[in-house]
A protein has these predicted regions:
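Extracellular and organelle-lumenal recognition/adhesion modules and their flexible linkers in secreted
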Residues: 23-191
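Bacterial N-terminal signal peptides that target proteins for export
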Residues: 2-13
Length: 191
């Protein structure tokens, strides 16, 4: 009986610790979005980051989920206009059933919708993975009005993401970040 009480106390303390460590408060500059955001918890988890004490996180909260959730940040194109940009960041996953990843979208005129978009659906993060660096590269056209970036979880599982950067890149690239050179390079593999 005493052992059962100790196990119950331990379980309660562990649950309290998890609730304290995982704060599903949306961080400044970010917002929660998606087709089924109420089926997920999203926010910040202390002590879970790759390079800092905190990491962004999205976690399914129900067994049956009919859509996705994303943690999103939007900003004006400003200095990125007419440039190629690269979103890079680190993500790890636990028990992701459908897919997860970063996404980058360039919205603009004339339609007001997406001029360019990549959500890694063609190279999804699935299952349980360690910290891995991912990249997305897109062109920001002259008629861009907004850049939207974030992390996405579609279906059951949990993801953590950290150390996200947006960089201007000089080399022409395709949407997956592969450099497209003006001519052949390093054909003898010496560079």
């Amino acid at each position: 009986m005493k052992l059962l009480k100790m196990k119950s106390l331990y379980s309660c303390l562990l649950l309290i610790l998890l609730l304290v460590v995982t704060s599903f408060t949306i961080p400044r500059g970010w917002h929660k979005n998606g087709t089924d955001p109420d089926s997920y918890h999203a926010g910040v988890e202390a002590g879970a980051g790759i390079s800092s004490s905190k990491a962004g996180t999205i976690q399914s909260a129900r067994g049956r989920i009919t859509g996705y959730c994303s943690l999103v940040q939007s900003f004006k194109p400003g200095r990125y206009r007419n440039k190629k940009i690269r979103l890079s960041g680190y993500m790890r996953s636990s028990d992701v059933e459908n897919y997860a990843g970063f996404f980058l979208r360039i919205d603009g005129e004339p339609t007001g919708g997406a001029l360019a978009f990549d959500n890694m659906e063609d190279r999804p993060i699935k299952g349980t993975t360690g910290w891995t660096r991912y990249e997305i590269t897109l062109s920001v056209s002259d008629n861009a009005r907004e850049i939207v970036l974030g992390a996405i979880l579609n279906g059951p599982g949990k993801i953590w993401f950290d150390n996200i950067h947006i960089d201007v890149i000089d080399e022409p690239t395709d949407k997956k970040g592969t450099i497209i050179y003006k001519g052949p390079v390093n054909l003898n593999f010496e560079e």
